[in-house]
Amino acid sequence: MTARTIGRAAQIAALATLALVAGCDEKLSDIAGPSPGLQPTFSSIAQNIFASTDNAGRAACTQCHTNQGRTPAAGLNLLPDTAYAQLVNVPSVFKPGAVRVVPGDADNSYIVHKLEGRSDIVGQRMPRTSGPFLTDGQMLVIRRWIDKGAQND
């Protein structure tokens, strides 16, 4: 292979990589992990996940799980000032024996099952109406918060 052929192949590879990255709908931070500033604390999760909005202004979770002008879906109000008391050690209203958040045990926390769309859930994966599901990075932060004791921090 000549130097010119190798140079041309490198240019084509660089352009192909650029086209793939530019055409991707997901942000690289969504693929790699949580966005900067998102921490495994309740206050960070409540503000940056539960009450966050997309580019169209739709709330990821509080579009349905709010008491503002309505009864919250599943009786679960995820506004930051009330969410903790309605999540931690609270039984699911639809799945007998399931607890929404089991401190120290993300694998047995029903909210994780619902957000990941596991086969044992009642109803649909969440969030169901507001667009994309949570990223792997966001789920990792929620799991870490639960596994470290689900503190109201």
Task: Give the predicted meaning of each segment.
Residues A51, G117, R144-K148:
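Residues within well-ordered alpha-helical secondary structure of globular protein domains
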Residues L28-Q39, S43, Q47, D54-P132, ...:
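Solvent-exposed helix-loop boundary motif
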Residues M1-F42, R143-D153:
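Post-cleavage N-terminal segment of exported redox proteins
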